[in-house]
Design a protein with these regions (language model features):
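Class I (Rossmann-like) S-adenosyl-L-methionine-dependent methyltransferase catalytic domain
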Residues: 1-44, 49-102, 119-131, 136-209
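Short catalytic micro-motifs in class I SAM-dependent methyltransferases
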Residues: 111-115
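A conserved beta-strand element that flanks and buttresses the S-adenosyl-L-methionine
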Residues: 108
Length: 209
């Protein structure tokens, strides 16, 4: 399997070597919430990591399901939920294999896609397509981290650079409704940026027309 393994991520969380972790939910979460773009519903957080967004969503009244295949990440998210005196459904499973019992109204995608080697992006987007109900919203924060090796064709990460041309190919307009650019740039403490985009999931009938 290309890219980092479960053991790689487990060691990172156990050693607290998680430089991508802001220490809090992304400021974009508060922006979406305050504007009404994101409102309480059944929401999935794949690749939940340390669970900052999981806690923030649960506190805001969402019915949250948090998904991660790393035991230490699930344990940390559980600890933070207990500390915050709030609740969410925690699922330890591989995002490329897990099947939901019912579709979700929304998905909060921030740290899963950029943690996966690009070889697995298509399979992951297929899972997003299956998890999200028609008309549901994908709240995406796509990592922008162009590395020097890219000029020589190297694929470097994690986190992997989420090129917007690649995102348009992965999320075609036949299945996903895109808002017009420009998109909000969200600074990261590590000096990276994320692009905030909300996609609407088209119904099969609309997608086939």
């Amino acid at each position: 399997m290309a890219g980092p393994t479960r053991e790689f991520w487990q060691q990172r969380f156990v050693a607290n070597e998680t430089p991508w972790d802001r220490g809090a939910a992304s400021p974009q979460f508060a922006t979406w919430l305050a504007s009404g773009a994101l409102a309480p519903c059944r929401i999935l957080v794949p690749g939940c990591g340390g669970g900052h967004e999981v806690v923030a969503l649960a506190r805001a009244g969402f019915a949250v399901t948090a998904l991660d295949y790393v035991p230490a990440a699930i344990a940390l998210t559980r600890e933070r939920l207990i500390e915050a005196n709030t609740r969410a459904t925690l699922v330890q499973a591989d995002a490329l294999e897990w099947q939901a019992a019912a579709p979700f109204d929304a998905i909060y995608e921030q740290t899963c896609l950029c943690a996966l080697h690009p070889d697995h992006w298509r399979a992951y987007v297929d899972r997003l397509d299956a998890w999200l109900a028609p008309g549901g919203r994908l709240y995406a924060l796509w990592m922008q981290v162009i590395r020097a090796g890219a000029a020589e064709g190297l694929v470097e990460g994690p986190p992997y650079h989420c090129d917007m041309n690649a995102m348009r190919a992965l999320f075609p307009s036949s299945r996903w409704e895109w808002p017009p650019p420009p998109y909000t740039r969200v600074p990261h403490p590590r000096g990276w940026e994320e692009l905030a985009v909300v996609l609407a999931h088209r119904s099969p009938a609309v997608a086939s027309t």
